[in-house]
Amino acid sequence: MSTVATSPGLSSFFSGKPLRFIAASILLVNGLFPAIWILFTSLKTEAELTVKPITWFPHAPTLANYMQAFSDQPLHLFLFNSFMVALLSTALTILISVLAAYALARLNLKYRALILSLIIAVSTFPLVTLLVPLFEIMRALNLLNSWTALILPYTVLSLPVCTLMLVSFFESIPRDLENAAMIDGCTRIGALFKVVVPLCAPGVFTAGILAFVNAWDEFLLALSFNSNPALRTLPVGIQLYQGEFAFPWPVISAALVVGIVPVAILIVIFQERVVSGLTAGGLKG
């Protein structure tokens, strides 16, 4: 049986920091390049965008595209609708997922494994397969053309992932802490929200961010369930900037940047909690 010798330098390269740095750099560039390109495009004029050869950086940056984005369409209204729908669906998602995850983590349920398996299975359903059933439900309940028609489906779609994430966090909290709180007079629900949830804050914040971003970015349901111009969300509103034969990419890019900024700010503010929540969830899971 023969062995192939490898040089110490090559072995240290593939197992050490250089390879990890290169891989991280590739992932970073792959993730940031589209956003940076959109930002540069939003600062260019239409003439500069179509010139050849392509210019990477805007020669004379302008904010005219941003002003036009707000004047051509009610971008502020799109932002408000998206924010309210995302905020309300996130709050509802966190409330239900906290209660569901706590029950799965603490109660001796007979079919716990089956329930967890069903949650995982539901989370894999493609959204397009749920479109018609959800539409029929919303129409039967007379909820079309309302925020509720989006808030409820967004909550349902985010619940599986958020619940599974929080189950692992709740299982890591010693039961003695809850028992001590209940001895001091807390109810079980009181112990949950006063003791367990604060200790699982990174996981709760991470689940909230995921639910918020999912609702903020969603397009298909927002387009299908709402035909009221006053209730359009940002993804649906942005498509209105393009005409039948015209695609004002600088203006569209400006609207996209405006839509990215709130989510970026949210992630920057809570980045430590999100990172700790993702890493802790991965270790506990």
Swiss-Prot record:
It is found in: Cell inner membrane. Keywords: Cell inner membrane, Cell membrane, Membrane, Sugar transport, Transmembrane, Transmembrane helix, Transport. Part of the ABC transporter complex SmoEFGH involved in sulfoquinovosyl glycerol (SQGro) uptake. Responsible for the translocation of the substrate across the membrane. Gene3D superfamilies: MetI-like. The keyword Transmembrane helix applies. Its main location: membrane. It is a multi-pass membrane protein. SUPFAM superfamilies: MetI-like. The keyword Transmembrane helix applies. One of its GO terms (biological process) is transmembrane transport. This is Sulfoquinovosyl glycerol transport system permease protein SmoH. Belongs to the binding-protein-dependent transport system permease family. Residues 79-270 form the ABC transmembrane type-1 domain. The complex is probably composed of two ATP-binding proteins (SmoE), two transmembrane proteins (SmoG and SmoH) and a solute-binding protein (SmoF).
